[in-house]
Curated annotation (Swiss-Prot):
This protein binds to 23S rRNA in the presence of protein L20. Keywords: Ribonucleoprotein, Ribosomal protein, RNA-binding, rRNA-binding. NCBIfam families: L21. Part of the 50S ribosomal subunit. Contacts protein L20. GO terms for molecular function: rRNA binding; structural constituent of ribosome. InterPro entries: bL21-like, bL21-like_sf, Ribosomal_bL21. The lineage of its organism: Bacteria, Pseudomonadati, Spirochaetota, Spirochaetia, Leptospirales. The keyword tRNA-binding does not apply. One of its GO terms (cellular component) is cytoplasm. This is Large ribosomal subunit protein bL21. HAMAP family: Ribosomal_bL21.
Length: 104
């Protein structure tokens, strides 16, 4: 059984007990929450397609820990103008586990 959920402007294909990284959701480590937007669910031989989302299916998630993504470096310069600028960025992420998945 799997489902396609939307968390933080991104879509994820998830299964039971799967762990994945998502953008920071505003929840603290150890807190549980439900995926608000469930787009697709498949169980045994039944397929449930949301138009645009499913109301009956439910996916419960638990935040395991807060992590940071890889460092991204950016650099800009303008030739012959003695202008250059460099900066970096690390995205704040959360490791999330699928606790329960039901497509009723």
């Amino acid at each position: 059984m799997y489902a396609i959920i939307s968390v933080g402007n991104r879509q994820y294909k998830v299964t039971q007990d799967q762990e994945f990284l998502t953008e920071k959701t505003g929840k603290n480590a150890g807190e549980s929450f439900d995926a608000k937007v469930l787009l697709f669910a498949e169980s045994s031989n039944k397929v449930h397609i949301g138009q645009p989302e499913l109301k009956t299916a439910r996916v419960s998630l638990k935040v395991l820990e807060d992590v940071k993504g890889d460092k991204i470096h950016a650099y800009v310069y303008k030739r012959r103008k003695n202008y250059q600028k460099a900066w970096g960025h690390r995205q704040k992420l959360q490791k999330v586990k699928v606790v329960s998945l039901s497509a009723v």
